[in-house]
C-alpha cells in the first residue's frame, strides 16, 4: 500500500498537495475586524478565486494531484457519521458557551455535510438565525458583534494548520485565536477520511499541545533533518517538544535546526524569509541576517541524557554541513537593494513553492526575485497574485504537500 503521506524533502517532485479555494469567508471580512482576522485589506473574492484557480491549474499541468480541504472535510464528516460531535467541538472552541451555542448547534445541524463545512469556514452571522427573544444583557446592547462564529479567512493558507514530516504529521496549535479552529478540519480528515484513516498516521505533535507551532515554520531539509523557525507564530518550547517527539518516534530524523527570526508580522513564519529551491540553493530575505551573514541557529540532537542543543551563528555553513555539500547558495529576495528587497519580501518574494528540484512556483509581482532565481538556474512558473497576496502569504503558504518523491 502506498503511503498516504510522504515528505522527506522540500524539493522532491511534488505528487499530492492540499489546498483550500478562497470562499465566502473572505466576504465576511469588514474594516472593523481586519486586524483580529489577520488581514491588512479586503480582497476582491471573484478575482481571488480566478487567481487561485490559475495557481491550481499550474500545479495540475505539472501532473500534481490537487486535493481540496473543503471537499475532504465534508467527505470525512459524512464517513464519521456524527455531525453533532464535530460541531460541538467547533462551537466550544469558538467561545460560544452561553445559550446561543444551542441555537447555533440546532441551526447548523439542519445542514448536510457540505453545507455545514462551508458554513463553519465562512462564519455564521447573527442575522442568519431567526430572531428569538433576548434574555441576556449582552444581547440587548446596541453595539453587537455581528458573528456567532467568526469566519476563517486564512484557511486558504493550508500550509500552517498542519505539516507532513516523513510519513507522519504535526497537527498544529495555531498562535492566533483567529486561526485556532483551522486544524480541527485536518484532525477530522486524518481520522475519518478513507484516504488516511486506513493507515496508521503518526502524529508527531497534536493541536492540544500547550505551545504554538505552525506549518510555515516547518521545513523538511532532508530525510534526517527538519528546520523549524522560532518566530512570531512558533514558540521555542514547541520546537523542543517536537524534536523530542521526532527523536523518540521517527528513527530517521537525526537533527532539528531551530532558526531564530525576528518576531514581526512581515516575517511571521520562516517560509516568508527562507525557502529551499534546489539541492543546494535557497531563497533568503537578507534582512534576517546581520552584515556578516549570520543569524542564530540551534542544532537539536538526541543525547544520552535528553536533548543536546548546540548554538551556532553560521547558518549557511550549518546548512552545507547537514546537506554534506561544500557550500550552499543563498539567493537574496529582491536582490541587494534594501527597498526592493523589503517590498518583494512583503509580497512573498521568498515564499517559493518547489514542485521539483530546481523548479518553483512564485508570484508574478516579484520580478527582481524571479529574475534572480532564473539567473541562478531555477525554472520559475509565475502565477497571478494581485488579490491572493493581500492575505500575506505566497505559493508555499497556500499549499500543504502530502506526498513528494524521495530524492
UniProtKB/Swiss-Prot annotation:
Highest taxon of the lineage: Bacteria
Pathway: Amino-acid degradation; L-arginine degradation via ADI pathway; carbamoyl phosphate from L-arginine: step 1/2
Cellular component GO terms held in the UniProt record: cytoplasm
Pfam family, one: ADI
Membrane-spanning ranges: none
Record field: catalytic activity: L-arginine + H2O = L-citrulline + NH4(+)
Annotated localization: Cytoplasm
Disulphide bridges: none
Catalytic site: 397 (amidino-cysteine intermediate)
GO biological process, one term: arginine catabolic process to ornithine
Protein keywords: Arginine metabolism, Cytoplasm, Hydrolase
GO molecular function: arginine deiminase activity
Similarity field: Belongs to the arginine deiminase family.
Protein name: Arginine deiminase
Amino acid at each position: 500500500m502506498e503511503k498516504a503521506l510522504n515528505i522527506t524533502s522540500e524539493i522532491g517532485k511534488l505528487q499530492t498537495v492540499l489546498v483550500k479555494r478562497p470562499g465566502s469567508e473572505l466576504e465576511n471580512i469588514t474594516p472593523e475586524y481586519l486586524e483580529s482576522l489577520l488581514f491588512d485589506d479586503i480582497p476582491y473574492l471573484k478575482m481571488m478565486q480566478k487567481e487561485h484557480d490559475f495557481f491550481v491549474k499550474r500545479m495540475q499541468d505539472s501532473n500534481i494531484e490537487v486535493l481540496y480541504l473543503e471537499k475532504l472535510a465534508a467527505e470525512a464528516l459524512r464517513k464519521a457519521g456524527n455531525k453533532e460531535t464535530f460541531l460541538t467541538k467547533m462551537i466550544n472552541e469558538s467561545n460560544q458557551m452561553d445559550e446561543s451555542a444551542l441555537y447555533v448547534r440546532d441551526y447548523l445541524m439542519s445542514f448536510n455535510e457540505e453545507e455545514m463545512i462551508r458554513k463553519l469556514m465562512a462564519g455564521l452571522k447573527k442575522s442568519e438565525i431567526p430572531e428569538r427573544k433576548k434574555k441576556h444583557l449582552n444581547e440587548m446592547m446596541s453595539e453587537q458583534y455581528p458573528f456567532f462564529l467568526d469566519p476563517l479567512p486564512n484557511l486558504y493558507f493550508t500550509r500552517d494548520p498542519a505539516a507532513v514530516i516523513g510519513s507522519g504529521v504535526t497537527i498544529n496549535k495555531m498562535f492566533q485565536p483567529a486561526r485556532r479552529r483551522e486544524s480541527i478540519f485536518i484532525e477530522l480528515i486524518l481520522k475519518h477520511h478513507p484516504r488516511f484513516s486506513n493507515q496508521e498516521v503518526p502524529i508527531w505533535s497534536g493541536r492540544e499541545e500547550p505551545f504554538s507551532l505552525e506549518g510555515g515554520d516547518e521545513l523538511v531539509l532532508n530525510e534526517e533533518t527538519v528546520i523549524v523557525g522560532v518566530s512570531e507564530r512558533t514558540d521555542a518550547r514547541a520546537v523542543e517538544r517536537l524534536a523530542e517527539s521526532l527523536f523518540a518516534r521517527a528513527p530517521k530524523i537525526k537533527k532539528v535546526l531551530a532558526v531564530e527570526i525576528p518576531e514581526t508580522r512581515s516575517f511571521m513564519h520562516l517560509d516568508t524569509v527562507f525557502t529551499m529551491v534546489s539541492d543546494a540553493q535557497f531563497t533568503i530575505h537578507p534582512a534576517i541576517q546581520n552584515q556578516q551573514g549570520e543569524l542564530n541557529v540551534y542544532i537539536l540532537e538526541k543525547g544520552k541524557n535528553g536533548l543536546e542543543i548546540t548554538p551556532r551563528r553560521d547558518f549557511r555553513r550549518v546548512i552545507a554541513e547537514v546537506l554534506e555539500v561544500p557550500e550552499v547558495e543563498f539567493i537574496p529576495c529582491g536582490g541587494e537593494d534594501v527597498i526592493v528587497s523589503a517590498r518583494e519580501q512583503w509580497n512573498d518574494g521568498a515564499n517559493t513553492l518547489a514542485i521539483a528540484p530546481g523548479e518553483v512556483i512564485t508570484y508574478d509581482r516579484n520580478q527582481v526575485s524571479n529574475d534572480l532565481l532564473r539567473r541562478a538556474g531555477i525554472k520559475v512558473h509565475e502565477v497571478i497574485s494581485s488579490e491572493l497576496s493581500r492575505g500575506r502569504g505566497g505559493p508555499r503558504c497556500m499549499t500543504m504537500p502530502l506526498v513528494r518523491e524521495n530524492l
